[in-house]
Amino acid sequence: LKDHSDDKPAEFDADFPQKPHIVMVVGVNGVGKTTSIGKLAHLYKKAGKNVMLGAADTFRAAAVDQLKIWSERADVPIIQQGQNADPAAVAYDTVESAKAKDADIALVDTAGRLHNKKSLMNEMAKIKRVMGKVVEGAPHEVLLVLDASTGQNAMQQAKAFTDFVDITGLVLTKLDGTAKGGIVIGISNELDVPVKYIGVGEEIEDLQVFDRELFVNSMFKD
């Protein structure tokens, strides 16, 4: 269980090989995606980085509003457009702005409508393409947010997303309740994608860097 070298880095790594470092965040609605982005922004800001958020989940007015609230809580700027704006346009603006304002990192929230795979696939591809036009190699990370409490369902969602976007890391939320740890390790091993962060509560500080050894040990404690 403990042997998956990629998710060893238990300390928070805020050093990027390039600037701005672009992170695209994916996941279905209701898994805590926007909340996780807010908490990540807070972590990076605390580490002394210039952070920018991009609200490219434009089909859900609540998502943009929610991200705006988190941007205020974390005290970082946000790039947004009106509801139903083209997500790729928002992503483009975010990356362009991050570059112009010398930001260290941009976190871009994207829509998670898995029921319409074709359009979502096209949208993701377009978002990646426009980001890459502004900053070479962007997005440098693609994080998939999953609700650990949904068990097998989380596994299916993870597989569905990996079909059309290269996931580089997992964020597992709602781990503050009963032991749902097995699914965390299961998804990571099955997809061969490291778990980067775990969400253990509602507060801004409640996103932790994943430490596999510590995590597995705590699973087997009485």
What are these regions (language model features)?
Residues 1-56, 63-83, 91-99, 103-108:
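Primarily NTPase-proximal linker/entry elements flanking Walker-type ATP/GTP-binding cores
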Residues 66, 87-101, 115-221:
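Conserved catalytic-core segment of NTP-binding enzymes
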Residues 111-113:
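Short glycine-rich anion-binding loops that position phosphate/pyrophosphate groups of nucleotides
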